[in-house]
């Protein structure tokens, strides 16, 4: 497909279960999503770094459960009854809930009615800065599973998928070149893909090792400027 045409298309990542890249760092999380509705207490906390795949797994679960996605900033005591009526709720940024009593009510109401709750956060519930004692005890008791940072194999696979989502093709030697040089994290992989996409579009050239070197240099410059 012509690159000019690709630039005019919206970027829509593949979010199906079959599109999720399973590896040692995330296989427990995948197993728990697949295990639904057999969740103890009807709730699960899924935590991991930005870009680790929490949102992808949540979308898989939402499609299966018919659940609703709520951001923690929108969770209020008055909104709880309406939210709980969905029967299955994904709470994004659950570690940043402003009204702790609202989350406590949501947990209790969903459990009472046989509903389900999937909490997404960067840290495990036991590490949240929770002030309400009753909520803290519920969170500590909640089944939780984390996604660790990727190994080299998954890091390369993640970059390939993100590039494919953007309709970009890249030789495997370029991926190997980058995996050996970028930080081993989902965030670094995502930033690299965005940088490569921008450079390839601006220079109207294929993704090569030369372009990858330029992307690495740009990322290093941004990092150095941020640190200074």
Specify the residue positions occupied by each region the protein language model found.
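Conserved C-terminal helix/linker of AAA+ ATPases
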Residues: 200-218
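Post-Walker A helix-loop "phosphate-sensing" segment adjacent to the P-loop in P-loop NTPases
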Residues: 62-73
């Amino acid at each position: 497909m012509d690159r000019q045409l690709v630039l005019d298309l919206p970027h829509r990542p593949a979010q199906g279960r079959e599109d999720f890249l399973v590896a040692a760092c995330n296989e427990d999380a995948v197993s728990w999503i697949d295990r639904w509705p057999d969740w103890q207490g009807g709730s699960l906390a899924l935590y991991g770094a930005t870009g680790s795949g929490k949102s992808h797994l949540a979308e898989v679960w939402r499609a299966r459960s018919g659940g609703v996605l709520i951001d923690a900033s929108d969770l209020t005591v008055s909104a709880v009854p309406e939210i709980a009526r969905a029967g299955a709720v994904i709470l994004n940024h659950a570690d940043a809930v402003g009204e702790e009593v609202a989350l406590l009510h949501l947990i209790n109401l969903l459990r009472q009615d046989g509903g389900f709750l999937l909490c997404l956060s960067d840290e495990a519930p036991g590490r949240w800065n929770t002030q309400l004692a009753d909520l803290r005890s519920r969170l500590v008791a909640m089944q939780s599973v984390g996604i660790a940072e990727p190994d080299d194999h998954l890091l390369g696979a993640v970059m390939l998928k993100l590039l494919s989502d953007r309709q970009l093709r890249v030789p495997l030697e370029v991926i190997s070149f980058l995996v050996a040089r970028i930080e081993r994290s989902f965030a670094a992989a995502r930033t690299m893909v965005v940088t490569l996409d921008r450079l390839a579009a601006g220079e109207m050239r294929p993704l090569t090792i030369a372009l990858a070197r330029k992307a690495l240099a740009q990322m290093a410059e941004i990092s150095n400027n941020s640190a200074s």
